[in-house]
Amino acid sequence: MHKILLAEDDNDMRRFLVKALENAGFQVSPHDNGLSAYQRLREEPFEMLLTDIVMPEMDGIELARRASELDPDIKIMFITGFAAVSLNSDSEAPKNAKVLAKPVHLRELVSEVNKMLAA
């Protein structure tokens, strides 16, 4: 079973994502901010980081950067309402990261997660 670390500060969106991913057969560890997600990542390995970009305490780009330092093989996907401006060329986000724009459709999310984990 694939393990996904989820960082999303919006409670409803986080519950929505957890339910969709668990129904698709993934094990999900949900967190409401980047700092707590990073602390969890330091405790155990995950195959994927699924994160919002704009969050309190530590934003998703910083979380992704640190996650890549801990585990260069971790797959990273951003889910954000700010997709158009989120990952410009000056961004410190990992180059292989995928971005999905909110609102995200469950079928698309699960499909993209499966594609990234299979790569």
Identify what each model region corresponds to.
Residues 62, 83-101, 107-112:
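Alpha4 helix (beta4-alpha4-beta5 surface) of REC/receiver domains from two-component response regulators
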Residues 8:
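Conserved acidic carboxylate
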Residues 33, 59-62:
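Acidic catalytic/metal-coordinating carboxylates
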Residues 52:
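Active-site residues of response regulator receiver
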Residues 55:
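Receiver (REC) domain active-site loop signature in two-component systems and cognate sites
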Residues 25-32, 40:
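Short hydrophobic/Thr-rich beta-strand motif most characteristic of the beta2 strand and flanking loop
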Residues 12-23:
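Charged docking surfaces used in two-component/phosphorelay signaling
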